[in-house]
A protein has these predicted regions:
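Short, well-formed alpha-helical segments that are part of the catalytic scaffolds
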Residues: 11-25
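Active-site acidic Asp-centered loop
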Residues: 38, 87-89
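Acidic donor-binding/catalytic loop of UDP-sugar-dependent glycosyltransferases
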Residues: 43, 91-98
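A conserved acidic beta->alpha catalytic loop
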Residues: 37-46
Length: 98
């Protein structure tokens, strides 16, 4: 069963590396993380794009620019998994979440 993680992202550079590590270790090769970027004025977008280049499970998409709820809705619309987890941009996942 394919798992999708939907993330609404806005200036989360301070947390993104640790967060992705805690998420990706729990996902299989067929799973995905959809990151809807509503803004990254903290300079973190290049880091996100590099992470997506290095791990094909990460997909970075343009956010709608209309707040966190619309940004989550955008991420969810792009998910293709049977199970969808939501992740705020500063979540650190416990090892047994998935």
């Amino acid at each position: 069963m394919k798992i999708s993680v939907a993330m609404a992202y806005y200036n989360g550079g301070m947390y993104i590396e640790e967060q992705m590590d805690t998420i990706l270790t729990q996902l299989g090769a067929q799973d995905e993380v959809i990151v809807s970027v509503d803004g990254a004025s903290d300079g973190s977008k290049p880091l996100l794009l590099k992470m997506a280049e290095e791990d094909k499970r990460i997909h970075v998409i343009k956010g709608p620019g209309k707040g966190v709820v619309k940004n989550f809705e955008n991420a969810i619309r792009h998910c293709s998994g049977e199970i969808i987890y939501l992740s705020d941009q500063d979540d650190i996942w416990k090892p047994d979440k998935v």
